Protein backbone atom coordinates (compact mmCIF):
# COMPACT_ATOMS: atom_id res chain seq x y z
CA UNK A 1 0.00 0.00 0.00
CA UNK A 2 2.92 2.32 0.69
CA UNK A 3 5.30 1.17 -2.03
CA UNK A 4 6.83 4.15 -3.79
CA UNK A 5 5.83 6.68 -1.13
CA UNK A 6 8.11 8.67 1.16
CA UNK A 7 7.34 6.30 4.04
CA UNK A 8 8.62 3.33 2.05
CA UNK A 9 12.07 4.93 1.93
CA UNK A 10 12.38 5.29 5.71
CA UNK A 11 14.74 2.95 7.53
CA UNK A 12 12.03 1.70 9.90
CA UNK A 13 9.59 0.90 7.11
CA UNK A 14 9.51 -2.18 4.90
CA UNK A 15 6.59 -2.77 2.55
CA UNK A 16 4.56 -5.79 3.66
CA UNK A 17 6.33 -6.21 7.00
CA UNK A 18 4.58 -5.99 10.33
CA UNK A 19 5.07 -2.77 12.28
CA UNK A 20 8.26 -2.19 14.21
CA UNK A 21 6.94 0.77 16.20
CA UNK A 22 3.80 1.04 18.41
CA UNK A 23 0.78 2.81 16.93
CA UNK A 24 -2.69 3.77 18.08
CA UNK A 25 -6.13 4.36 16.58
CA UNK A 26 -8.45 7.06 17.85
CA UNK A 27 -6.31 7.48 20.96
CA UNK A 28 -6.46 3.76 21.75
CA UNK A 29 -3.44 1.49 21.86
CA UNK A 30 -3.14 -1.45 19.50
CA UNK A 31 -1.06 -4.62 19.69
CA UNK A 32 2.61 -4.08 20.45
CA UNK A 33 5.06 -4.87 17.62
CA UNK A 34 6.36 -7.96 19.42
CA UNK A 35 2.79 -9.27 19.78
CA UNK A 36 1.64 -8.82 16.20
CA UNK A 37 2.93 -12.05 14.60
CA UNK A 38 1.37 -14.29 17.25
CA UNK A 39 -1.92 -12.36 17.33
CA UNK A 40 -2.26 -12.41 13.54
CA UNK A 41 -1.49 -16.13 13.43
CA UNK A 42 -4.13 -16.78 16.10
CA UNK A 43 -6.68 -14.62 14.27
CA UNK A 44 -6.14 -16.37 10.93
CA UNK A 45 -6.20 -19.81 12.58
CA UNK A 46 -9.46 -18.98 14.35
CA UNK A 47 -11.09 -17.73 11.16
CA UNK A 48 -9.86 -20.50 8.85
CA UNK A 49 -11.02 -23.15 11.31
CA UNK A 50 -14.63 -22.22 10.52
CA UNK A 51 -15.80 -24.28 7.57
CA UNK A 52 -18.75 -22.04 6.72
CA UNK A 53 -18.23 -18.31 7.19
CA UNK A 54 -21.09 -15.99 8.10
CA UNK A 55 -21.66 -12.24 7.92
CA UNK A 56 -20.86 -12.06 11.65
CA UNK A 57 -17.60 -13.97 11.16
CA UNK A 58 -16.25 -11.55 8.57
CA UNK A 59 -17.25 -8.59 10.73
CA UNK A 60 -15.57 -10.13 13.80
CA UNK A 61 -12.39 -10.77 11.80
CA UNK A 62 -12.28 -7.18 10.58
CA UNK A 63 -12.74 -5.72 14.08
CA UNK A 64 -10.01 -7.96 15.53
CA UNK A 65 -7.67 -7.11 12.63
CA UNK A 66 -8.12 -3.41 13.36
CA UNK A 67 -7.50 -3.97 17.07
CA UNK A 68 -4.19 -5.60 16.23
CA UNK A 69 -3.35 -2.96 13.60
CA UNK A 70 -0.45 -5.08 12.32
CA UNK A 71 1.13 -2.64 9.87
CA UNK A 72 2.79 0.68 10.50
CA UNK A 73 0.59 2.47 7.97
CA UNK A 74 -2.35 1.71 5.70
CA UNK A 75 -4.14 -0.82 7.92
CA UNK A 76 -7.65 0.44 7.19
CA UNK A 77 -6.97 0.73 3.45
CA UNK A 78 -5.38 -2.72 3.35
CA UNK A 79 -8.31 -4.23 5.25
CA UNK A 80 -10.76 -2.62 2.82
CA UNK A 81 -8.93 -4.07 -0.20
CA UNK A 82 -8.74 -7.51 1.43
CA UNK A 83 -12.44 -7.36 2.26
CA UNK A 84 -13.47 -6.42 -1.28
CA UNK A 85 -11.33 -9.12 -2.90
CA UNK A 86 -12.49 -11.73 -0.41
CA UNK A 87 -16.19 -10.96 -0.81
CA UNK A 88 -15.85 -11.21 -4.58
CA UNK A 89 -14.80 -14.85 -4.17
CA UNK A 90 -18.35 -15.56 -2.94
CA UNK A 91 -19.91 -13.75 -5.89
CA UNK A 92 -20.77 -10.47 -4.16
CA UNK A 93 -20.59 -7.41 -6.42
CA UNK A 94 -18.63 -5.02 -4.22
CA UNK A 95 -16.20 -2.20 -4.90
CA UNK A 96 -14.41 0.62 -3.11
CA UNK A 97 -17.23 3.17 -3.51
CA UNK A 98 -18.69 2.63 -0.03
CA UNK A 99 -15.28 3.07 1.60
CA UNK A 100 -14.60 6.27 -0.34
CA UNK A 101 -18.05 7.76 0.23
CA UNK A 102 -18.13 6.92 3.94
CA UNK A 103 -14.44 6.87 4.84
CA UNK A 104 -14.82 9.11 7.90
CA UNK A 105 -17.84 7.16 9.13
CA UNK A 106 -15.96 3.88 8.62
CA UNK A 107 -12.97 5.03 10.67
CA UNK A 108 -15.22 6.30 13.45
CA UNK A 109 -17.20 3.05 13.41
CA UNK A 110 -13.95 1.16 13.93
CA UNK A 111 -13.17 3.34 16.94
CA UNK A 112 -16.65 2.78 18.44
CA UNK A 113 -16.14 -0.96 18.00
CA UNK A 114 -13.20 -0.74 20.41
CA UNK A 115 -14.04 2.16 22.72
CA UNK A 116 -15.03 1.45 26.33
CA UNK A 117 -15.56 3.88 29.19
CA UNK A 118 -17.12 1.63 31.80
CA UNK A 119 -17.02 4.31 34.48
CA UNK A 120 -19.47 6.37 32.41
CA UNK A 121 -21.49 3.40 31.18
CA UNK A 122 -20.09 3.47 27.64
CA UNK A 123 -19.47 0.13 25.94
CA UNK A 124 -17.87 -0.82 22.64
CA UNK A 125 -20.40 -1.64 19.93
CA UNK A 126 -20.12 -3.07 16.44
CA UNK A 127 -23.60 -2.02 15.30
CA UNK A 128 -22.27 0.90 13.25
CA UNK A 129 -19.82 -1.39 11.45
CA UNK A 130 -22.63 -3.89 10.93
CA UNK A 131 -24.67 -1.25 9.11
CA UNK A 132 -21.68 -0.21 6.98
CA UNK A 133 -20.88 -3.77 5.90
CA UNK A 134 -24.55 -4.55 5.38
CA UNK A 135 -24.71 -1.66 2.89
CA UNK A 136 -21.44 -2.76 1.28
CA UNK A 137 -22.13 -6.47 0.98
CA UNK A 138 -25.89 -6.92 1.05
CA UNK A 139 -27.15 -3.75 -0.62
CA UNK A 140 -29.16 -2.42 2.32
CA UNK A 141 -29.45 1.36 2.68
CA UNK A 142 -28.80 2.17 6.30
CA UNK A 143 -28.29 5.88 6.88
CA UNK A 144 -24.64 6.30 7.89
CA UNK A 145 -24.22 9.45 9.98
CA UNK A 146 -21.21 10.25 12.15
CA UNK A 147 -23.31 12.05 14.74
CA UNK A 148 -25.18 8.83 15.53
CA UNK A 149 -21.92 7.40 16.87
CA UNK A 150 -21.37 10.14 19.44
CA UNK A 151 -21.39 8.49 22.86
CA UNK A 152 -23.84 11.09 24.20
CA UNK A 153 -26.14 11.14 21.18
CA UNK A 154 -29.60 10.97 22.77
CA UNK A 155 -32.06 10.52 19.91
CA UNK A 156 -31.18 7.15 18.38
CA UNK A 157 -31.92 7.42 14.67
CA UNK A 158 -29.02 5.13 13.85
CA UNK A 159 -31.44 2.49 12.55
CA UNK A 160 -29.88 -0.46 14.33
CA UNK A 161 -32.85 -2.52 13.18
CA UNK A 162 -34.63 -0.86 10.26
CA UNK A 163 -32.87 0.41 7.14
CA UNK A 164 -33.77 3.67 5.41
CA UNK A 165 -35.32 1.68 2.59
CA UNK A 166 -37.05 -1.58 3.58
CA UNK A 167 -35.15 -3.89 1.29
CA UNK A 168 -34.85 -7.56 2.15
CA UNK A 169 -32.94 -7.65 5.43
CA UNK A 170 -30.40 -10.30 4.53
CA UNK A 171 -28.11 -9.11 7.33
CA UNK A 172 -30.50 -10.58 9.93
CA UNK A 173 -30.65 -14.08 8.43
CA UNK A 174 -28.90 -17.22 9.61
CA UNK A 175 -26.91 -17.85 6.44
CA UNK A 176 -23.34 -18.44 5.40
CA UNK A 177 -21.67 -15.94 3.08
CA UNK A 178 -22.14 -18.37 0.18
CA UNK A 179 -25.86 -18.57 0.88
CA UNK A 180 -26.20 -14.81 1.30
CA UNK A 181 -24.47 -14.22 -2.04
CA UNK A 182 -26.91 -16.55 -3.83
CA UNK A 183 -29.89 -15.02 -2.04
CA UNK A 184 -28.83 -11.52 -3.07
CA UNK A 185 -28.48 -12.60 -6.71
CA UNK A 186 -31.96 -14.13 -6.67
CA UNK A 187 -33.34 -10.95 -5.10
CA UNK A 188 -31.85 -8.86 -7.90
CA UNK A 189 -32.77 -11.31 -10.67
CA UNK A 190 -35.72 -13.60 -9.79
CA UNK A 191 -35.43 -15.37 -13.16
CA UNK A 192 -31.79 -16.34 -12.68
CA UNK A 193 -30.92 -19.95 -13.57
CA UNK A 194 -28.77 -22.31 -11.53
CA UNK A 195 -26.13 -22.41 -14.27
CA UNK A 196 -25.95 -18.61 -14.14
CA UNK A 197 -25.45 -18.79 -10.38
CA UNK A 198 -22.59 -21.23 -10.99
CA UNK A 199 -20.96 -18.70 -13.32
CA UNK A 200 -21.51 -15.74 -11.00
CA UNK A 201 -20.29 -17.44 -7.81
CA UNK A 202 -17.66 -19.80 -9.16
CA UNK A 203 -19.24 -22.62 -7.14
CA UNK A 204 -20.11 -26.07 -8.44
CA UNK A 205 -23.61 -26.95 -9.61
CA UNK A 206 -24.00 -29.37 -6.71
CA UNK A 207 -23.10 -26.59 -4.26
CA UNK A 208 -25.63 -24.23 -5.84
CA UNK A 209 -28.32 -26.91 -5.66
CA UNK A 210 -27.53 -27.51 -1.99
CA UNK A 211 -27.75 -23.79 -1.26
CA UNK A 212 -31.04 -23.45 -3.12
CA UNK A 213 -32.50 -26.38 -1.18
CA UNK A 214 -31.40 -24.77 2.08
CA UNK A 215 -32.94 -21.40 1.17
CA UNK A 216 -36.22 -23.09 0.27
CA UNK A 217 -36.22 -25.19 3.44
CA UNK A 218 -35.71 -22.05 5.55
CA UNK A 219 -38.56 -20.44 3.58
CA UNK A 220 -36.33 -17.60 2.39
CA UNK A 221 -37.29 -18.27 -1.24
CA UNK A 222 -39.91 -20.20 -3.19
CA UNK A 223 -40.54 -21.12 -6.79
CA UNK A 224 -43.60 -19.58 -8.48
CA UNK A 225 -45.27 -20.11 -11.89
CA UNK A 226 -43.75 -23.51 -12.50
CA UNK A 227 -40.35 -25.16 -12.44
CA UNK A 228 -39.36 -24.64 -16.07
CA UNK A 229 -40.72 -21.19 -16.92
CA UNK A 230 -41.22 -19.79 -13.44
CA UNK A 231 -39.11 -17.53 -11.28
CA UNK A 232 -37.95 -17.22 -7.70
CA UNK A 233 -39.67 -15.16 -5.05
CA UNK A 234 -37.74 -13.88 -2.03
CA UNK A 235 -39.82 -14.22 1.14
CA UNK A 236 -37.63 -12.20 3.48
CA UNK A 237 -39.62 -9.37 5.09
CA UNK A 238 -42.83 -11.04 3.94
CA UNK A 239 -45.27 -13.16 5.88
CA UNK A 240 -44.72 -16.82 5.18
CA UNK A 241 -47.75 -18.51 3.67
Where are these regions (language model features)?
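FIC/Doc superfamily catalytic core
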Residues: 1-241
Amino acid sequence: MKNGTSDSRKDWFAVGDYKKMPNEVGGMETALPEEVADKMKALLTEYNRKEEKTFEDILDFHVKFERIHPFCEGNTRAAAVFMIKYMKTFGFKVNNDAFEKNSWYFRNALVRAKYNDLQNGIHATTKFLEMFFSNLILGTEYELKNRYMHVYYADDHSQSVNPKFPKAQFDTLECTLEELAVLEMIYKNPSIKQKELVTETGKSLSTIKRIMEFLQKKEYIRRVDGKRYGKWEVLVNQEKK
